[in-house]
Amino acid sequence: SWVKFNMAMILPANTADENVTMMLSTPEEIIAEARAGRMFILVDDEDRENEGDLIIPAEFASTNMINFMAKEGRGLICLALESHRCDQLGLPMMVTRNTSRHETAFTVSIEAREGVTTGISAADRAKTIAVAVDDDTHAHDIATPGHVFPLRAKEGGVLVRAGHTEAAVDISKLAGLKGA
């Protein structure tokens, strides 16, 4: 049976390839999902990474959302940020020479300086994200390293780099939210 996941269809693992049907949403539908604080799956071209990422605008990154991403997505919990916000938080790049295939712009990992325990729980990571996107947060409110992995979006968004990082920031901004 099909499971509806905010405008994207997820198929059971045993679905045969010839039976796969993908339903893609319009940009307007995805922007509406973001504005409403609902998670969506962002997919890229099969000639690029050929993957889908679970995306939620950072303002809505609750403990439950982070827990779902960690359990079901089974990947890193990343935080796409505009470059000026990375600068405000004093986040240097993770490496000085990025040799990854798509040049994903990881900064050093982060943690909220206060209000977290070990940093790894879904609640702690949600708190870290909330602190990082709060307009009143400054560099001294963030500790490094941590358990959230910020990604620095290129200025100019998807018009400059067709990556999930830039798309996540652009969609949030088009939804009237913070670029994160």
Descriptions of predicted regions:
Residues M7-A180:
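Catalytic domains of riboflavin
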